[in-house]
Design a protein with these regions (language model features):
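Acidic, low-complexity terminal tails and accessory targeting/binding regions
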Residues: 1-8, 33, 48-50, 66-135
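Generic beta-sheet signal
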Residues: 45, 49-58
C-alpha cells in the first residue's frame, strides 16, 4: 500500500503513527522501540567483530545507526537511510566514520519527514503533506 492509501483507508492509525512514530505499533506489528530492544544483543556482538556485513530493512538500520552513532532516540524514525546503499562504518578510537555508497538502482525516495499536523480528524491532503513523491 502507498502512504496515501494507508492515510485514506486507515486515517486514525496513520495519524497515531505520525503523532508518535517512535513508539507506535501497527496492529500485530512492532514499534521502533520494540526493534531497538530486539537488536540490542546483536549490537553487543557487532562491537566485538572485526568486519561484519549487515543486510537489513531501513527501520532496523535506523535503529542500529542511531544506537551506534549515539543519536537521540526521538530522531530515530526520521533518520535518512537511503535504499540500495552500502553504509560503511569505521570505528577508530572513540569515533565512528560513516560512508554512504549508493548502488545504481532506480527507486523511489521513501524518506518521510515528521509531519506537523498529526490530528486524527485531519483531511487526507493534510495527512499526506510530507509523503515523498512517487510514480
Amino acid at each position: 500500500m502507498t502512504y496515501e492509501e494507508i492515510a485514506d483507508i486507515f486515517p486514525v492509525e496513520f495519524a497515531l503513527r505520525d503523532a508518535d512514530k517512535l513508539r507506535y505499533r501497527y496492529p500485530n506489528g512492532e514499534s521502533y522501540m520494540d526493534v531497538v530492544q530486539r537488536i540490542k544483543p546483536v549490537l553487543e556482538t557487532i562491537k566485538e567483530e572485526d568486519n561484519l556485513l549487515i543486510i537489513s530493512h531501513q527501520a532496523t538500520l535506523r535503529c542500529l545507526l542511531t544506537m551506534i552513532l549515539g543519536y537521540p532516540s526521538e530522531d530515530l524514525p526520521y533518520m535518512k537511510v537511503p535504499l540500495h546503499t552500502v553504509i560503511k562504518l569505521t570505528f577508530l578510537n572513540d569515533e565512528v566514520t560513516v560512508e554512504y555508497h549508493r548502488l545504481p538502482v532506480e527507486c523511489v525516495d521513501t524518506h518521510r519527514v515528521k509531519p506537523t499536523n498529526c490530528d486524527i480528524s485531519r483531511q487526507l491532503e493534510d495527512a499526506c503533506v510530507t509523503v515523498p513523491f512517487h510514480l
